[in-house]
Swiss-Prot record:
Enzyme Commission number, as recorded: 1.17.1.8
One CC-aspect GO term: cytosol
GO terms classed as biological process: diaminopimelate biosynthetic process; lysine biosynthetic process via diaminopimelate
Active-site residues annotated for this sequence: H127, K131
Keyword list, A-Z: Amino-acid biosynthesis, Cytoplasm, Diaminopimelate biosynthesis, Lysine biosynthesis, NAD, NADP, Oxidoreductase
Native source organism of the sequence: Thermotoga maritima (strain ATCC 43589 / DSM 3109 / JCM 10099 / NBRC 100826 / MSB8)
Record-given protein name: 4-hydroxy-tetrahydrodipicolinate reductase
Superkingdom of origin organism: Bacteria
Enzyme's top EC category: oxidoreductase
Length: 216
């Protein structure tokens, strides 16, 4: 598979390149603040950079008819509309978290909340000091799995890649469910699965859950 990275020189860009190269995939498009280096036509473009970069990313996907794996957070409605339009021409996977564990947790929460429907629920998320958006896209994703609005508490400290704790409470007992991303590698592995999934797919919007669980 030939692939491109938007945000190539960033921390996630470097992690993505490492994971993809270990599987023998060829990096043919590099995009960062210094410009664009085009070596060949990519099958898939990976973008974990910023919402501001999305218009350029969309243009590149259209130019090469390349699928898009988008892990950028803090997207607004205008960005989502751009993705919907792009998905008419190429296959797109957009997710706020490409950790397999988080997406398994999301599915679990959607079932658990049916049993604990009268319990209090709150979410606590912790990320590194450089993360700009709060609450995190992942916390919002987990809230959506609960099917209702719940309090979300955001901490920005040190170099934490990402901790998410969902706390259920009732009189006399609590349940805490925690997911911890130990390194950015987990997100790069998820991006790899999504990219390989997209190769040969018809245009359309695909969820990361479809990548993991298929049609279940």
């Amino acid at each position: 598979m030939k692939y491109g990275i938007v945000g190539y020189s960033g921390r996630m860009g470097q992690e993505i390149q490492k994971v993809f190269s270990e599987k023998g995939h060829e990096l043919v498009l590099k995009v960062d603040v210094n410009g664009v280096e085009e070596l060949d036509s990519p099958d898939v473009v990976i973008d974990f950079s910023s919402p501001e970069a999305l218009p350029k990313t969309v243009d590149l996907c259209k130019k090469y008819r390349a699928g898009l794996v988008l892990g950028t957070t803090a997207l607004k409605e205008e960005h989502l509309q751009m993705l919907r339009e792009l998905s008419k021409e190429v296959p797109v996977v957009q997710a706020y978290n490409f950790s397999i564990g988080i997406n398994v947790l999301k599915r679990f929460l959607s079932e658990l909340v049916k049993v604990l429907e009268d319990w209090d629920v709150e979410i606590v998320e912790t990320h590194h000091r450089f993360k700009k958006d709060a609450p995190s896209g992942t916390a919002i994703l987990l809230e959506s799995a609960l099917g209702k609005s719940v309090p979300i508490h955001s901490l920005r400290v040190g170099g934490v890649p990402g901790d998410h704790v969902v706390v259920f409470g009732n009189i006399g007992e609590t349940i805490e469910i925690k997911h911890r991303a130990i390194s950015r590698t987990v997100f790069a592995i998820g991006a790899l699965k999504a990219a390989e999934f997209l190769v040969g797919k018809d245009p359309g919007m695909y969820s990361f859950e479809e990548v993991i669980f298929g049609g279940e």
